[in-house]
């Protein structure tokens, strides 16, 4: 019986046709070539046929069957549909649907979308919404969906190439960095970070986009907006921002380029921000990872720069360093500048101990150091040129150790004193020259105006020269000889009377007629001449009837112009600056007809005199001068003493006098006495004040002038016996504890350091290093060593691995100790004093103790040694310098020459090398013998002995006893430390005479620093690996959960198929089709098979990415590496690319990026996977769920053969 409604039996397919069909399916879903070959070779024909049927049935059920709504769904899911929508301001629903399709559809769909210029349209939509001045929630949502779609496109290689084809696309993406929405901002930064490392063109494109952002947003500084992300309270944004900063720095292959970008962020203050974020690192491990990575990369780049600059040159070899710089600059623009710098430095060298040369070199070193670190050095330049190298004129010699520092300091102080004296003399000469110039100018003006005698009279009244009481007036006789005048004093009243008599005397008529025929100028000149002659004679005016000198013989006098003014002014008038016409100039002008005497009688002369009379200041000056204060000593010194006196509030001069005499420490505390020591009055100042007082006593009471406050104070305390010695003794006493307790702990620290160096763990590490070194140097001249010089431990960091980046012999030593002898890793925790003492100076501390001992000996000698009374020594022999430090070299007036001091220093050095532990004591004995030898010369200028009840003797006796005990203990400690140093140097094979204690300890400190940093590097590397492993395990766990849920769904469907109704349906189908039994089995594996195929696409391994042509998911993998800080892996991947050399950035329609890398900023955090789930918290996931639910409903529809759910599907789509 023929089955009318039965299906004909299908023809069996050949294996070749099955392979072709299976290969086409693999091509359609985008399986990579390597996996495609693997599947084709390993999978049997039956399994291939099952996969083909499973894929075909799903495709057939989705795309072929259904009503009109299903056909409509096919259209709305096509790339053409989305491209058309993007051209016409798409809605947020369309953009969401496009994002879902880009994530779910096969690569063939994506390629078709890209071929229709979908990227450009997406960028256009992004720009249109970004440029809006006011953005609403929908605009922000659209921007987020566009960015998410672009990220999905860039997740494949051909999609990435389509995006970076136009550099303006990256420009447009970077402009969204200022969006207020946090997740969108984070996504932009993540895209930029991944782009830096995913392609060789990525870093130039991103830097170009930063430049474009800076220009468009009009930012003043590069990267400023990106940098602000570190200050955002969001931890995710902070970590992502820091990740982008590290990516921008570390992605470049050139260390110079990396340092340039890093310096840009240093100028923005990233170092300070890293310190401010310290509390956040504990709660934000991603941020802590990025911080550690930044510091590590910075340290590595600095080391690499040094190595590149010097090659194998040592830092301690200046000749090799100069040669290396010359080799690098030869033939370039820097050569001439470098040569000029060397020439200037050579010309500036005068003497290594001169403070100016040393100051200049220290200044140059400081400025260049700040330039290399990207720090500002303008303040240092201003301070150096404005303040002589420092705010207080001091010189930084802290790094100079030992007696050399003492000699330098002494010479500096001597030069300062000499400079001060020279400046004072020059200032006095300048003042004197100025006074003389003013007097000459005034006298010339007075002579021209005919008032020479009046000017001299005023000078006599105003000024009284100091030697006026001793000088004798002289008169000049007609013969030119000078004879003394009478010694009777001339009072001011007599001079005024004579002056008025001289100026008001009238000439006889004959003289008047004679003068009336002279010209006005001649008349004035003759008057001046007569007055000058009178003033230069004996001072007695001419009698009233005496005629003036006759005119020159043979001369004809010109007619004079008649006097046009009726009377002269009674007072001196201001001048009217007109240009006068003479009679001969007004002949043909209207002035010829003017009545010159018309207003002589009616002119208000008194009113004019009151309004325009010249101001008279003589009386006011006399009032100011009378009883005014006078500064006798140097003005600046007097001002400083006045400032010092202002410290004594509510303390009178008598109280200060008593405090100095009795050494009262309650009034003269440490800070006050340190200032007081600088202004001890000198003998010249005291003599000048005494002379001034004697001069003023000879003047009348009303004409005496007062001393200034500073001079009164000096005059008061100058009567204290042994004033200078008392102030110096109190200064020494108050400063003794501070100096002793500053030097003694440093010496004790050296003592402890040398004891700690005898640690057995140190020797164990040295043994291990020796074994490693002999193995590495086997067969070379350096091999087969029985030991090594101790500073060789710092050269371990120069031996680097050729496999692991930045991995040195120090890293290997740490890993070896961790695996074999972990207890040795804490060796440096057992020697803390070694690290601390390496930054101190043993010679400087011991020299300080020597100075204190010498000061005690001198003080004891002055107080207790009874000597005959003699002339008081001059203040120039002071034993304490202006900085408050004892100058033991001035204890005698017969100071040693430099040659003697040098020979003495050589003898002391020879004694130190010969002695064994007693060098300090021997030098101290020598110093004592010097003091005793010079005592005979001191006796000539010594003072009378102190009385037993003198406070100076009473108070200092107890101090001397206590201080001697303290100094003895310290000197014993110094001797013990010297012995320890020599023994430890001998133990390590070093010569103690050729190395300083602090230099020896610095070797271990430097190795300790490298050991700690290398250990930190390994910890960071381990942390990166742990995080990567954790992410991988988490990813595998999620995949297993997905597979488990899929299997459960399959089992549930199988159970459903195995139900009675389903069994009947299967039997009916079996009767109608013999092949349906196979299809039912195939259908059970539909989901499993599709999941298996897509697994090869969605989870490619990093190793496959380099060989893949269409790899998918690579952006996520790169972001994970960036978050973990695994830039070593990123650089390794870049080296495996075909073109590892980075090309220059191509900036379309933009100016070429300058070398200085002045780029703007952006921000960063990690949310790639989070954003996939919740892009904007705007029900985006709900839209995606609706799409998935729609697909599941279609699947159930096909399995059950039920067409009644079409309406439900339409509602789901809507």
Curated annotation (Swiss-Prot):
Keywords: Actin-binding, Coiled coil. Gene3D superfamilies: Formin, FH2 domain (1.20.58.2220), Leucine-rich Repeat Variant (1.25.10.10). Residues 1161-1171 have a biased composition (Low complexity). Residues 868-877 have a biased composition (Basic and acidic residues). Residues 541-554 have a biased composition (Pro residues). Residues 10-379 form the GBD/FH3 domain. Residues 457-544 form the FH1 domain. GO terms for cellular component: actin cytoskeleton. Pfam families: Drf_FH3, Drf_GBD, FH2. One of its GO terms (molecular function) is actin filament binding. Interacts (via GBD/FH3 domain) with activated Rho-GTPases. Belongs to the formin homology family. Diaphanous subfamily. The DAD domain regulates activation via by an autoinhibitory interaction with the GBD/FH3 domain. This autoinhibition is released upon competitive binding of an activated GTPase. The release of DAD allows the FH2 domain to then nucleate and elongate nonbranched actin filaments. This is Formin-D. It comes from Dictyostelium discoideum (Social amoeba). The gene is forD.
